[in-house]
Each structure stands twice: as C-alpha cells, then as structure tokens.
Amino acid sequence: GNSGARESTYTITIERMPLPENPVKTQISCFSWTDAIARGPEMTALRDGVRGKDKLDVPIKFIWNYAGNTIINQHSDINKTHDILQDESKCEMIVVIDNFMTSSAKYADIVLPDLMTVEQEDIIPNDYAGNMGYLIFLQPVTAPKFERKPIYWIMSEVAKRLGPDIHQKFTEGRTQAQWLQYLYAKMLEKDPQLPSYDELKKMGIYKRKDPNGHFVAYKKFRENQEANP
C-alpha cells in the first residue's frame, strides 16, 4: 500500500484564480456520477460513500464538463453510460467546454469551444516529478479560429447574464490580461527572486533548481518518526 498521494516535486510559486467557498457540502466520488443520475435519491453514505449527508436528496440533472472526457471514454462500462445519457428525462442538460469535438462533447446539449494554449497568453508552472521548477509564459502563435473564445470570456459572459452584481464579483473589473498581471504581482510578493512580469514575458521560460537538490517524500517523518508521527 501507499499514501494514495501523487508523486511530488519542487515547484516555483504560482498564484491561481481565487475560488469562492462552495456552499454545497454534499459530495460523491467522481466515479459514481452515473449512479447519481440513474438512482441519485437511493444513494446513501453507508452504501455509496455520500459525504456531507446521509443520502442524496435529488439526482444529477445538469453536468458542466470542462476540458475532460469523463462523460464517456474515461468512465467504465461505456455502453451502460451511453444508455443512461440517452434518457433525457434523467440528465436534462450537458454543457461541454473543450478545444475539439471529443467523445464526451458529442453527448452535449451545448458545446462551448475554448481556445488552445497556443492562442492566448498565460503562465504555467512545472507539473510534477522533477527537481527543476519552471514557469512558461505562453504567447499566441496563431490567431483564434472560428467562433472559439477564451474560457475567461465565456464565464464572464455567463456571469453577465446572471446579473451585474454577479459579473462584477466574478471579474472584479479585470480583463484576462489584467488578471494575469495581478496574479503575477502576488507571486512576486511571495517570491521576490522571480523576474518581473515583462522580463518573464521576454524570457519565455524561467527555470530554478531545487535548492535542496531533490525532493524527499515525508522528509520530516523519515528524519524523526517520533517527533513527526
């Protein structure tokens, strides 16, 4: 056995978009979403691992799927999943946001086409399993094609239709480019060794080696089990 955690790594400071607290505390496992569509009110904490409640009150009626194929080809028993989704009296609305017409997107009632990373500015950090931290300043190498829009634009437009107060709370009055600069300024506050925003944009890639040489999982526990049980 193991801890169930992913392999770890050395990473450079990254600041992500702030997320409000989710008011819905009831949870199910990612894998059991088809059960929640087909027999939601029958699912209980004891039998199905429902968290935050003894049982589900209602089934899933709406799916918002962003950049993933969980709907069909990354789920088990595709034929059963297909049959569940074909009954529109169960899950009544599926929205998919993606770059391509994936297997999951074909089941959507609404498809919102997103931009690819090579079509917009962004900053991404290294992922995992390495001793070199880095930041990549993505810059568009081609213009957006057809009617595709950035995910921030899409969500801003959704927020706008929910009301001016929701739109202001979501965007905080910033464009996508302004958010990128705002978040990077917060990164600089935490990590003054980073280059300036304009310097990073010019460099394209910023690298920094792990100052400890390499990452050791549960290092404190390994060094002193009694002090770090």
Residue spans for each PLM region:
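Long, C-terminal catalytic modules of enzymes
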Residues: 136-220
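Flexible glycine/proline-rich, aromatic-decorated loop/lid segments
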Residues: 103-137
